[in-house]
């Protein structure tokens, strides 16, 4: 990892494959590694009215990302080579950035029968049923054994459906004050506990999606201390907001929900001590109509690729919570390391001093629903570079 200013960039021999022109850029712009997001929803095939691989890639470029991993809640679900090829062909046709698909754990993400894991393994980054937790202990154990035999990770959306009770936001102060049904923290951490037992039994490499609770941090920290091969991610929104920041607006609805201040502080501590390995956006665009029905009626999911770095830089780095180097580890280095990718000649040029207000009208994504709209941030993207080539943004 290296962070350079433009004037240093101009004199180094490290970037031999760079074919762009930066001589006119200000010397105090920073050159950062291209980010890697292991958790995005690009909606193609099946839901192109929400997002396409092309619009999602443009959104990623506009946030300094050069590699993304796309979740399998598509139509058709990539549970067979035939279905996966539809997505692979669309990715190849776009070709803007590195887009790597997940294969599903189960057929149709229904949790009842394993996908054609062996057939699709060579073409996917890992296996996940993100959007749904695998409810059956036996099914998850079978999936872990199969993934281990294929040297692939299981990437788990941890959610025990039996504990949801119709909830749609965190079961905390805001829910109680405003008569909303809450989702308890146990719905997340109880399934993490179950999965860790299965990981110990099977020896699979295991990664937990979007952790949001203090208990999840504590459980994963303990598992790491015991030598379990486990990594995890959290999202920018869980590090910046607590449930008292909620508004009855669909742009504050996602799964898992924004939780308490105690949870937020525990997540930050997990970032600082290495329990949490990476930050992923869970970029999940929907149409305006699908996000315009308040907290109760809107679909889960927010967009995040274009706001992640400025939000985190402003709220964590400029405030002294973590260093810029640590943030780069979380957004660029650790994700690639865990999933066996290399950085190559990918980087982005940032004006870290620029202050501006986030406006969803500026997003390249088809989705415009963001809890960060209206916030003032520092860190404006100037250029994104993939394999030494400046990308149009």
Residue ranges and their predicted role:
Residues 29-94:
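Metal-associated gating/positioning segment near the N- to mid-region
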């Amino acid at each position: 990892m290296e962070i350079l200013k433009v004037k240093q960039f101009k004199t180094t021999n490290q970037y031999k494959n760079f074919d762009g022109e930066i001589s006119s850029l200000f010397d105090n712009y920073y050159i950062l590694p291209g980010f890697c997001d292991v958790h995005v929803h690009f909606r193609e095939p099946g839901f192109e009215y929400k997002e396409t691989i092309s619009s999602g890639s443009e959104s990623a470029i506009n946030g300094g990302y050069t590699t993304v991993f796309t979740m399998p809640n598509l139509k058709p679900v990539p549970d067979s080579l035939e279905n996966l090829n539809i997505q692979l062909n669309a990715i190849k046709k776009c070709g803007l950035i590195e887009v790597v698909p997940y294969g599903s754990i189960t057929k149709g993400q229904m949790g009842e029968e394993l996908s054609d894991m062996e057939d699709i393994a060579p073409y996917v980054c890992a296996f996940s049923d993100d959007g749904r937790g695998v409810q059956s202990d036996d099914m998850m154990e079978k999936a872990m054994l199969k993934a281990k035999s294929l040297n692939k990770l299981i990437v788990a959306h941890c959610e025990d459906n039996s504990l949801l009770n119709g909830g749609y936001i965190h079961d905390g102060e805001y829910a109680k004050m405003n008569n909303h049904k809450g989702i308890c923290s146990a719905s997340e951490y109880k399934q993490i506990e179950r999965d860790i037992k299965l990981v110990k039994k099977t020896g699979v490499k295991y990664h937990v999606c979007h952790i949001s609770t203090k208990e999840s941090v504590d459980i994963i920290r303990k598992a790491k201390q015991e030598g379990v091969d486990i990594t995890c991610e959290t999202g920018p929104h869980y590090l910046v907001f607590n449930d008292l920041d909620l508004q009855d607006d669909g742009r504050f609805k996602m799964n898992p929900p924004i939780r308490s201040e105690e949870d937020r502080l525990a997540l930050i501590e997990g970032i600082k001590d290495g329990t949490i390995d990476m930050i992923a956006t869970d970029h999940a665009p929907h149409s305006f109509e699908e996000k315009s029905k308040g907290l109760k009626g809107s679909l889960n999911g927010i967009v995040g690729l274009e706001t992640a770095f400025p939000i985190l830089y402003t709220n964590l780095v400029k405030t002294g919570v973590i260093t810029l180097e640590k943030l780069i580890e979380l957004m660029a280095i650790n994700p690639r390391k865990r999933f066996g990718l290399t950085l190559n000649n990918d980087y982005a040029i940032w004006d870290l001093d620029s202050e501006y207000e986030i406006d969803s009208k500026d997003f390249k994504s088809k989705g415009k629903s963001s809890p960060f709209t209206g916030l003032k941030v520092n860190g404006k993207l100037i250029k994104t570079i993939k394999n030494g080539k400046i990308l149009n943004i």
